[in-house]
Amino acid sequence: MKPPVSSVVLFTLAGMAFAIPKHGFDFVVGVDGDFKAAKAAAAAIKTSEDTHFIIFFPNGEYNLGTLTGDGNQLTKFNTSHVSFIGESMEGVTLFNSSIEESISKTATLQFNTADDIYMQDLTVQNKSTTCSENACRHVTIQQVGDKYVYKRVRLISGQDTYYTNKGGRTYWDGGEIRGTVDFICGDGDVFFEGTKLVPTRSAAVITAGKTTTEWGYVFNNAIIESQFNNYYLGRSWNHAKTVFLNTKMIATPEAAGWQNPINEVPIISAEYNSMNGNGQKLDLSGRRRAYTDKNGGSANLNPVLSDTEAAKYTLKNVLGGSDSWAPDKLTEQADAPSITQVGKSVKWADDENAICWAVFVNGKYHSNTTDTRIGLDGIAEGSKVYLRAANSMGGLGEKSNEIVTVAATDSSVTDTSAADTSTVDTSTVDSIPSSPGDSATVPGDTTVTPGDTTKVPGDTTIARIERGHYAEPNRKQPQHLYTIKGQRVIKGRKKVMRALYGK
């Protein structure tokens, strides 16, 4: 477990971008302790939007209900500025099995007083199927605060799967939500981008908004999949605002599209450019227009947005707010590194958009590092190694190339990709330097890093190796130099020298 560093976000000033300061995972569940310990550690450390506490979950199932839940297996998490990062959406599941049904006391994770929560690459599931006479409400996530971000997150339950309890702002990037009745319900401005929605029973209802904010639920480029073709897009809980833009409905809903309200009539229940699974526009002429509620209220609404009306539903308009929040920037991924074995280490280039790199050995999480190298001590010869870069919130990007480790010594070089080694000439090397100030004669001049294979046309300076470790820029260790005088040039040939380790 590591203390957070000064910042994990990319700052800009006068159009200039600054590199994201490095920051390793603060807590790896199963390595640094269980989720109960992670929860306590996050609460004990001062955090802010610039210093997220990052909890990483390697692939596996994590029973929060019995570990941190109350008598009904509800887990409260009230610390702001925390990232929940999984290894994969399919491989990581946080779950509970609430005993009594309820919308307010069954959540797998309940965020009552937390703001600025980031989740990526995991599944949250409430496995309970317990019902009362009238309902089977078992929540996965219940959130109250502002600035929630979900990237490639899957929620699985039945009724009331996802409960946005207060009027904050939330952004979904991809992901999937499964349920039966009102399985996305509550308040707030929530922008769903490319999210998959899966009604899991006949006559299912996707949304039930009780909107007090300006925009409500906005679905853009959503995909609806189901084995049932008689579901509904939503019903108003209280004055709901819900729009579906550019939605691909692989399973098509009831012709009316919307149900009458639970309590009060909706403000807006509308679609724009709805398509079937083949990308063909759906006929929306049968969509519901007239609504009445149990209090005698009524509304007559246009179920189809015009081009002008639809154009207003931008991410900036819906979630920007007075502080110009841009959550899509937080979900951007750092590039996959290109890794190479050099001697007894694996190396890669730095990336100013990565806060750290997660290391995987033989398909399993091994470690994380803010450095651009890892030693191979403890990693067996023949192991398969790959890396994934973490973005500003800790979320992992695509895999790097995978290498198979080979036997190496401090003086061996396994990276020959940088030059044509068929013309290597080290015939004029007098000696390998063994202490500062020693020199050797080489054919050429350049500056090289020990372990590299580099063209050599003259004087050469190499960095001294401290017991086999690289003395690289930004590493917190002394950097000593050897100077090697180049005295011969062989014309008409490519001259290559392998930079060798000092002893």
Model-derived features: positions:
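Hydrophobic h-region of N-terminal signal peptides that target proteins for export
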Residues: 11-19
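Extracellular interdomain linker/stem segments of modular secreted and single-pass surface proteins
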Residues: 406-410
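C-terminal outer-membrane/trafficking sorting elements
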Residues: 438, 443-503
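Disulfide-bonded cysteine-rich modules in secreted/extracellular proteins
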Residues: 339-341, 411, 415-416, 465
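Short strand-turn-strand beta-turns centered on an Asx-Gly dipeptide
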Residues: 362-363, 485
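Sec-dependent signal peptide recognition
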Residues: 2-10
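Sequence-level preference for short, compositionally simple segments enriched
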Residues: 20-345, 352-361, 369-405
